[in-house]
Amino acid sequence: MVLPPPDKRHVCLTTIVIMTSMAFMDAYLVEQNQGPRKIGVCIIVLVGDICFLIVLRYVAVWVGAEVKTAKRGYAMILWFLYIFVLEIKLYFIFQNYKADKKNLETVARKALTLLLSICVPGLYLVLVALDSMEYIRTFRKKEDLRGRLFWVALDLLDILDIQANLWEPHRTGLPIWAEGLMFFYCYILLLILPCVSLSEISMQGEHIAPQKMMLYPVLSLVTINIVTIFIRAINMVLFQDSRVSTIFIGKNIIAIATKACTFLEYKRQVKEFPQNAIALELQQNSLSHNQTLHSTQGIPHEPSPTSEILDT
């Protein structure tokens, strides 16, 4: 498939978000080292950033080219690459904070958490680029999809909150095995779950139906809403961790109840969905090419009553 010309604004915005977060990570790494070691770390991160920029120069352009299409394949590649590099730098920052037990400066650690909580969910929303999906014409469908994207961003904040528990100062530390398990569990979730969400959007195509995107809600229900409740409960009860976020525990309980109601409603709708409506949906998909031709010729296309029923 030949991609259209890239959206320059989207390419610039993606590059700014990525390189801003990477620059701050590098600043933390360099600042945590002293003497001759600081020069060596500075050279290493500089070489790494140059290599990353070379790759980003091509991938960001490909992402900007597909932003107005129904595909998000290059967006998944860029997300995977970004999180892979970011979490490696974050791991060394976390280990440096852990080794320097005398430095309990709270502001720098809180600033690191704030930076991640803005850049990571922000990049996900930029890669989805909902406002650039011109093929989504109905306001109701776009707002439904926007609500689902908000849940993904909220889940990313939930994961980052658990990771931040490792470098933000607290009275009692966790065992080494627990720290490593928590960090890499969050690492895997950050790598995979947003890619699952992007792949669902990509697989739906131009006839996207947010109510049919059920893979991500199921995975997040198990891996985030349920598992993170147990993680926080164990940290709070067994390890007496005073920094456990009870607000996110409440958020996950509400999310479990909400998703349970959604799954029950979806199951009921599938059972009651008439067979003739399925046939009409297939017929509508087969005529999509003709509808596209009419729209390019300036003929306004009014949504049929059948499509309105199928969107509900």
Curated annotation (Swiss-Prot):
Regions annotated as coiled coil: none
Record's GO cellular component terms: membrane
Primary subcellular site in the record, as a coarse category: membrane
Keyword line: Membrane, Transmembrane, Transmembrane helix
Region (Disordered) residue spans: 291-312
Subcellular location field: Membrane
Spans traversing the lipid bilayer: 10-30, 43-63, 74-94, 111-131, 173-193, 219-239
PANTHER family from the UniProt entry: TRANSMEMBRANE PROTEIN 121
Family (UniProt): Belongs to the TMEM121 family.
Summary of the function given for this chain in its UniProt record: May play a role in MAPK signaling.
Protein name per its UniProtKB record: Transmembrane protein 121
Originating gene: TMEM121
